[in-house]
């Protein structure tokens, strides 16, 4: 007898789904005890506890970022309106405070965009494998098949790196 046959297996309740159109009219009213309702709610809450917390935190971060972007957009719109109002009237010199405010908003926006889209660059983790292949090809011109075993290690490295990127590590 194997270990899996002698060990107790976890009893999982079977899930039953019933469509309303499959139920005869006389059985459409079904009473469910509060115990059943609490068990269903408890399994639903227990199964998603960590995931729901993570999603709530992510949603809160995104909402904060969205609020900051809206504030910046509103400030930029106000500045744009002031600018167009100034152009349509008479050419008015920009005050020092207005200029500083515009510069600060612009710099903050540029910094946020750079941080969000351009800040993180992954290093070439497969550089060693790549260098070996290039060196082999240079040492063996016209004999590409001699370098074929090196490509397996390179492809494995690239595949692992791709999985890490997709997982978000």
Swiss-Prot record:
Motif stretch (Cx9C motif 2): 147-157
Lipidation (N-myristoyl glycine): 2
Signal peptide: none
InterPro entries according to UniProt: MICOS_subunit_Mic19
Lineage: superkingdom: Eukaryota
Protein's UniProt keywords contain Disulfide bond: yes
Paired cysteines (S-S): 126-157, 136-147
Name of the protein in question: MICOS complex subunit MIC19
